[in-house]
Structure formats: C-alpha cells, structure tokens
Amino acid sequence: MQILADLLNTIPAINSAAMSRAQRHVDGLLKPVGSLGKLEALAIQLAGMPGLNGIPHVGKKAVLVMCADHGVWEEGVAISPKEVTAIQAENMTRGTTGVCVLAAQAGANVHVIDVGIDTAEPIPGLINMRVARGSGNIASAPAMSRRQAEKLLLDVICYTRELAKNGVTLFGVGELGMANTTPAAAIVSTITGRDPEEVVGIGANLPTDKLANKIDVVRRAITLNQPNPQDGVDVLAKVGGFDLVGIAGVMLGAASCGLPVLLDGFLSYAAALAACQMSPAIKPYLIPSHLSAEKGARIALSHLGLEPYLNMDMRLGEGSGAALAMSIIEAACAIYNNMGELAASNIVLPGNTTSDLNS
C-alpha cells in the first residue's frame, strides 16, 4: 500500500544537534556529571525528538490498548476462556483494570480500542476499529491478509497522529487478548531467528505441562506461513494478530510526529520488532518501560538494543508497565528543566569541561 510506504518515509530523524546541546545543559546542572545516570540519558534522548522541539517536556499522556481475539486460542495455548477478552475490555471502560488504575495514577488517559474482539456486536465505550471477529488460527492459516494489516496500521497511525495534534506528547502501548503471547512468540522467533523453544513462555499462567504444545504451535505456524523476517507487515499478517498490528501502528504514528512511545511488555517487544523492520527510523522514539517476565523478553529486547528502566517481575500486559513508567519520563523532564546550574553557584567540578552551559 503506497500510502503506508510514503508515510514510513516521512518519519523524522532524531536531532543530533539538539541532543548535543542537551548533553551540555545536563552536564552543567547542579550535580556531579553523570550522577543521575539513566535519567540524564533519557532527558537527552527526549531532547532529540523533533516533536518536543528540543526541550524535554510532557503534555497530555495517553495509553492506547489494542483489544483482539486470536484464532490460535483453539489450539489450547491459553487457559483463560476466550470470552475474557470482551469481559476485560468492558472492565477497562469502567476504569477497574490494572492499566486503568496505573494510568489514572500517572494522569494518563486510556484509549480502549477494539481491533478484533470476537463478539456479535461492538462493545459500548470502546473505540471501534474492528477488522474481524478475531484473527485466523496461525497454526493452520495466516492471521490476516496483508491488506487487512496495512489498513489497520494506517487507521491506527492516523488515530495516533490526531491525538498528537490534540496535545498528546507521550504515548504508551498496551494490549488485551487471550492467547496473544503465542503470535507474539512467533513474531519474535521469526525476526530474531531464535528457536520457538527459546522464546515461548507461560503467558497468563499456562501450566508447564502444556508448554510443549504451545512451542509446537508456534513452530507449526512459522513453518506453514513462512513469514519473511525482513518484511514487518508480512510477519504481522502471517503469524501476528490485530492487537499486535495496532501496537505497531501506535509506534509508527508517534514516531511520525517525532514523539516518544513507551513500550509495555512482551507483546509490545514483538510489535516493535515488526515495526522496526518497516522503518528502522522509529527506534530512537521507543522507550522500554519494564522487563517482562515472559521467557523471550530478553531475546527480543537484545535484538532491539533496548534496556528497560524497571524490573518488577510484571507480565500483566494491558499497558500496565507503560503507565507505570510515565513518571520516569516526567522525572527526566523535571531534572532537565528545573534543576539549578553549577555556573550560577560558582561551582567548578573536576572533569566538567562544559564551556557554555546554556548553549
């Protein structure tokens, strides 16, 4: 789809000059150089994002939760009933799920988006971008057509860009869908080249005696569908799911506006791998929130070259980790904008060679 290709080509590069200025500013703050560690690096990374105009700051915050069912659930790869997807989506509209509580704590809005829930009628209160009532069973067929994947990507990109126009400067991604760690593992295995046995985990408490079947399902899905690891859209369409496509769309949409997007857990790592295959230029806009407890998490993150800020043994999904980490983004912005400067206090520290702290 040419429209998608054209959009991917417009993703702005990180502003290295702005990052250099930010580095000098951070080095001149009222502290020993480097003493705030990763917060300093994060502030500098944010300064380089064109959508923030060289000054790390947070406006409105939004967590976009992509909700979808998966045909591969029929293969016995999850213990939760498929109906839980719809039930939990309804609970999100009431603000009672984990991501809703954590997002409220962070002052972020949660956008609950139906991209493929298997119900006869749309669920009231959800944003309706439903492509179909669940994806195909990847163990016996592709998850969706390439056209479906491309259209959903574009729809989500446009929605994300509209939020940016309305003042959102920090995005988080989340998902909801029974059995969705199976297609996520298939994506990670395909793109990293690692064997399914290395990346398939227990998801939402799958009994260990059922893990061998889940590994076999992922292996069969890859063998049958033959996704091209160099083509992110192909991977998503053949062994992914509508929720994974939606997450990738948020990443692409935020990056196209020069704005940061917080990853969540394993599902978001998989979507990020596919999105980076579509456009490597988005990678500097991706901020990893936490280390998922899912088995293939470190493999996916290593391939992305990302190191999470939190390690909380979390594997809920929903965007819970992204919501939790929003305070870290705000902290990085706060130190950049609100700390005093060494020069103003006539402090000269050994090793600080900054000549013009305000340049």
Swiss-Prot record:
InterPro entries: Nict_dMeBzImd_PRibTrfase (IPR003200), Nict_dMeBzImd_PRibTrfase_bact (IPR017846), Nict_dMeBzImd_PRibTrfase_N (IPR023195), Nict_dMeBzImd_PRibTrfase_sf (IPR036087). One of its GO terms (molecular function) is nicotinate-nucleotide-dimethylbenzimidazole phosphoribosyltransferase activity. One of its GO terms (biological process) is cobalamin biosynthetic process. Transmembrane segments: none annotated. SUPFAM superfamilies: Nicotinate mononucleotide:5,6-dimethylbenzimidazole phosphoribosyltransferase (CobT) (SSF52733). It is an enzyme of class 2 (transferase). The keyword Transferase applies. Homodimer. Catalyzes the synthesis of alpha-ribazole-5'-phosphate from nicotinate mononucleotide (NAMN) and 5,6-dimethylbenzimidazole (DMB). Belongs to the CobT family. This is Nicotinate-nucleotide--dimethylbenzimidazole phosphoribosyltransferase.
